[in-house]
């Protein structure tokens, strides 16, 4: 570096990210990469926020804060907050972060992100994807949860007539039909 007239960089050791108490995360063992997490329906901001907090803790007034914008992470990051002990990757915690980010999105942004997943199950173009997205925003933890939540829009499931019978209320299929009308 000195030969080129460059400043000597400061090297920092970051502890490994572990899959459990005894094993490092590794693609060889099927642990997810960033692309895998994106394909599983996680938002980039949620992944960044979670990974940033794996081996680092903010100091000061934001020491208790979990959800950060990218600009807040950049502003608050300090090498002194890096942990010396390994961090354990918890997919449930990442899912919590992702659900928080999904719910915080503007309705239009959520509708745009959700539309491809809605269209996987709802093939009818007459169905308004943004109206469906408005119903889903508070109910999804990952974008990939959406297709299974909306698959009934195109084809209603077949219900057994016994479903409408209740002995306590003394209803049968005929009475139930009248009540529904």
Q: Which sequence ranges carry the predicted segments?
A:
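Alpha-helical recognition segments enriched in aromatics with Gly/Pro capping
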Residues: 1-102, 115-116
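Small-residue-rich helix-loop
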Residues: 107-181
